[in-house]
Curated annotation (Swiss-Prot):
SUPFAM superfamilies: NAD(P)-binding Rossmann-fold domains. Catalyzes the reduction of a carbon-carbon double bond in an enoyl moiety that is covalently linked to an acyl carrier protein (ACP). Involved in the elongation cycle of fatty acid which are used in the lipid metabolism. Pathway: Lipid metabolism; fatty acid biosynthesis. The gene is fabI. Belongs to the short-chain dehydrogenases/reductases (SDR) family. FabI subfamily. Substrate binds at residue 95. The record marks 201, 204-205 as: Involved in acyl-ACP binding. One of its GO terms (molecular function) is enoyl-[acyl-carrier-protein] reductase (NADH) activity. Its EC number is 1.3.1.9. Inhibited by 1,4-benzodiazepine and naphthyridinone derivatives. This is Enoyl-[acyl-carrier-protein] reductase [NADH] FabI. The keyword Oxidoreductase applies. InterPro entries: Enoyl-ACP_Rdtase_NADH (IPR014358), NAD(P)-bd_dom_sf (IPR036291), SDR_fam (IPR002347). It comes from Haemophilus influenzae (strain ATCC 51907 / DSM 11121 / KW20 / Rd).
Length: 262
């Protein structure tokens, strides 16, 4: 028996076997969790259904976090299969492509700012609102952030602001939901070569710099993040809430890589 045996967890954001959400689902399944999944549109539905089968699940629900109706419907449908459940993984982020290239000040638009915050940050709150009536005591909510929430990252631009908003939401939600025993945390993951990351300019250079600078001198994997996520959603982490847990091979603690000899 794994430490998530008996837990029911909804996983969002699964788009490929390179997705962080895939690594999370894999680790959670290995620890005994029962999983459900969401998909954004008809194009992704067959792919997510195949992944769901891989993880022994037949619960695959549509979810477009851009609309409140879709969010409400998702959890209403989930409740027909699970009257109560133990948490969800919010692995959702988006900004228009023109917001992720070059000079932030010149690239920024009102609409781009709105979309980035709506999809990447507000959606976490909206999902918690809709899920709240169906959550078991001691449930755990988990989202995914990035170091751009704390530092200026080239080409990450408006997503730096959106992730900062997401991390603030994590703390405020934790304070609010804590009285019901519900924990809320975020993982700030190091850069991983995912479909989402492919939209960031010079991402290969970012990975190279990361590997040279991180305390462990390596990049992180979806397995690294998945194992940490499984722990945070388990009763082993019962005293942890409102935290931003860095799973980044120690990159965030360093100021520069090795200087070498003069």
């Amino acid at each position: 028996m794994g430490f998530l045996t008996g837990k029911r967890i909804l996983v969002t954001g699964l788009a490929s076997n390179r997705s962080i959400a895939y690594g999370i689902a894999k680790s959670m399944k290995e620890q005994g969790a029962e999983l459900a999944f969401t998909y954004l549109n008809d194009k992704l539905q067959p792919r997510v259904e195949e992944f769901a089968k891989e993880f022994g699940s037949d619960i695959v629900l549509p979810l477009d976090v851009a609309t409140d109706e879709s969010i409400q419907n998702c959890f209403a449908e989930l409740s027909k299969r699970w009257d109560k459940f133990d948490g969800f993984i919010h692995a959702i982020a988006f900004a228009p492509g023109d917001q992720l290239d070059g000079d932030y000040v010149n690239a920024a638009t009102r609409e781009g700012y709105r979309i980035a915050h709506d999809i990447s940050a507000y959606s976490f709150v909206a999902m918690a609102q809709a899920a709240r009536p169906y959550l078991n005591p001691n449930a755990a909510l988990l989202t995914l952030s990035y170091l751009g929430a704390e530092r200026a990252i080239p080409n990450y631009n408006v997503m730096c602001l959106a992730k900062a908003s997401l991390e603030a939401a994590t703390r405020v939600m934790a304070a609010d939901l804590g009285k019901e025993g519900i924990r809320v945390n975020a993982i700030s993951a190091g850069p991983i070569r995912t479909l989402a990351a492919s939209g960031i300019k010079n991402f290969k250079k970012m990975l190279s710099t990361f590997e040279k600078t991180a305390a462990l001198r390596r990049t992180v994997t979806i397995e690294d993040v998945g194992n940490s996520a499984a722990f945070l959603c388990s009763d082993l982490a019962s005293g942890i809430t409102g935290e931003i847990v860095h799973v980044d091979a120690g990159f965030s603690i360093t100021a520069m890589g090795e200087l070498g000899e003069e």
